[in-house]
Structures are given as structure tokens and as C-alpha cells.
């Protein structure tokens, strides 16, 4: 199974494609946290779209995640507007 893995940090977004044996197509871009949660989600979607032929997406993120609905339960003020962001819903609608 080919899986896009994304790690959203306070300063960098790191990603890679797991091909079942190892990570390939590793990428890294600035989070630009001060631009806010909505802009961050657009950056993440664009990054994921840069991969091809994947079957699943895994995301780890700064902040606390509500495991029931995949939204950000709490994020500090470094990413304005990130608390309450429905990350899972956004990704499901896009992909």
C-alpha cells in the first residue's frame, strides 16, 4: 500500500511516500504558521496533490487532535485559527 505521510510542525511540514518498504519522495516546506490554519490546510493539500498513485494519507500535527472527528481540539497561538480546524473533514472532501 502506498501511503502519503505528512508531519505538520510549527515551523516545517515534512512529507514522504511510503511504498510498503521505505519512504520515497521526501519533501519539506515551511509551515508559515503566522498565515493561519486555513492557509496551512491549503499548503498541506497542495503538498499531498504533488504525490501520485497513493491509496491512503496519514497526518501527524502540532496541537491536540480530537480522535473522534479528526479536528484540532487545541493549538497554541503560533498557528492562528488552527484550534477547531476540521482536518479530517477537509482532507476527506479533497481526496
Predicted regions and their residues:
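Phosphate/pyrophosphate-binding loops at sites that engage ATP/ADP/AMP, CoA/4′-phosphopantetheine
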Residues: 44-57
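Short, basic and Ser/Thr-rich N-terminal targeting/leader segments
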Residues: 11, 53-55, 95
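Glycine-rich phosphate-binding loop and adjoining helix at the ATP-binding site
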Residues: 37-38, 66-95
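Glycine-rich beta-strand-to-loop/alpha-helix junction loops that act as flexible
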Residues: 57-63
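Short glycine-rich, Thr/Ser-proximal phosphate-binding strand/loop in the N-terminal lobe
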Residues: 2-42, 71-74
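Short, acidic Gly/Pro/Ser/Thr-rich loop/turn segments
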Residues: 13, 64-66
Amino acid at each position: 500500500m502506498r501511503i502519503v505521510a505528512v508531519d505538520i510542525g510549527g515551523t516545517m511540514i515534512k512529507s514522504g511516500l511510503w511504498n510498503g518498504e521505505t519512504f520515497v519522495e521526501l519533501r519539506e516546506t515551511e509551515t508559515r504558521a503566522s498565515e493561519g490554519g486555513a492557509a496551512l490546510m491549503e499548503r498541506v493539500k497542495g503538498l499531498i496533490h504533488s504525490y501520485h498513485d497513493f491509496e491512503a494519507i496519514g497526518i501527524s500535527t502540532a496541537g491536540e487532535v480530537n480522535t473522534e472527528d479528526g479536528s484540532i481540539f487545541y493549538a497554541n497561538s503560533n498557528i492562528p485559527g488552527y484550534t477547531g480546524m476540521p482536518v479530517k473533514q477537509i482532507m476527506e472532501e479533497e481526496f
